[in-house]
């Protein structure tokens, strides 16, 4: 989003709007008469548990840091100041985190996936296995469920093998992505949410159980294993949850 603010000898505040989180509204402080940006009482929600609040907090912190930098530069620029905050999308965020760089490469290998994760109008959760988790898998994402060794032994063409590898990688990535969640259809228990990965139709019963216990999150896969969420990273159009194992390990 691109806004242009004219500063006429006084300090004007700008908080960039985020499609992801909330549109701040203007209120007048009755005691001081000053205009303030505040959060509406009803926060528009796109994600389960408390992830909308996490997004709001991180967005406001980033915007505050941007404002501070902009105002430090005022003495070096004309009085007219252009503010720009397009935000870091999930596609960029995945590529910026070294601990999940392998998963980021698999994402880039899937046609259309980078474009989806770069779409600012989407609301997406990504459960990204660490490099160590992927390296420790008995079979790598491109090796199953289509058995590449057997295809080669059977004399499959290079094109057939390539297509099988692409299908395997796509399946692996989609198992770890949840797009545009319909919260009215999310199965809930106290402190938990049942989500459906992009591998399956939204009408299908969920295959990911996300739980919160205090300040910690865990994820249960279809195999029933509890995986620890090691880190949570926000982007302008979603959340990255770094997990210590694959949701689809063979």
Swiss-Prot record:
- Cell compartments where the protein resides: Vacuole
| Main location class | other
Residue spans crossing the bilayer: none
Q: Which cysteines are disulphide-bonded? A: none
Q: What keywords sit in the KW lines?
A: Signal, Vacuole
Could you name the Gene Ontology cellular component terms for this entry? vacuole
Coiled-coil parts of chain: none
Under InterPro entries, the record lists: FAS1_dom_sf, FAS1_domain, Mug57-like
Q: What range(s) does the FAS1 domain occupy?
A: 87-247
According to the UniProt entry, where is the signal peptide?
1-18
PANTHER family in alphabetical order: FAS1 DOMAIN-CONTAINING PROTEIN YDR262W
Per its record, how is this protein called by name? FAS1 domain-containing protein AER383W
């Amino acid at each position: 989003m691109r806004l242009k603010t004219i500063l006429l000898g006084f300090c004007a505040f700008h908080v960039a709007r985020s499609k992801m989180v909330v549109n701040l509204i203007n209120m007048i402080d009755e005691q001081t008469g000053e205009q303030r940006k505040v959060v509406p009482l009803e926060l528009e929600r796109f994600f389960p548990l408390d992830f909308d609040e996490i997004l709001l907090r991180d967005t406001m912190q980033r915007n505050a840091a941007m404002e501070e930098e902009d105002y430090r530069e005022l003495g070096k620029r004309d009085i007219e100041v252009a503010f720009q905050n397009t935000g870091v999308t999930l596609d960029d965020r995945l590529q910026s985190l070294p601990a999940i760089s392998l998963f980021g490469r698999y994402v880039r290998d899937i046609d259309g996936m980078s474009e989806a994760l770069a779409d600012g109008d989407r609301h997406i959760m990504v459960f990204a296995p660490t490099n160590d988790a992927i390296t420790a898998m008995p079979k790598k994402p491109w090796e199953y469920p289509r058995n590449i060794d057997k295809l080669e032994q059977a004399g499959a063409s290079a094109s057939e093998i390539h297509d099988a590898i692409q299908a395997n990688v796509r399946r692996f990535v989609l198992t770890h992505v949840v797009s545009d969640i319909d919260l009215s259809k999310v199965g809930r228990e106290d402190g938990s949410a049942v989500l459906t990965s992009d591998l399956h139709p939204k009408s299908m019963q969920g295959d990911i159980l996300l739980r919160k216990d205090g300040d910690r999150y865990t994820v249960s896969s279809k195999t029933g294993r509890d995986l620890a969420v090691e880190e949570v990273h926000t982007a302008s159009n979603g959340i990255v949850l770094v997990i210590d194992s694959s949701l689809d390990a063979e």
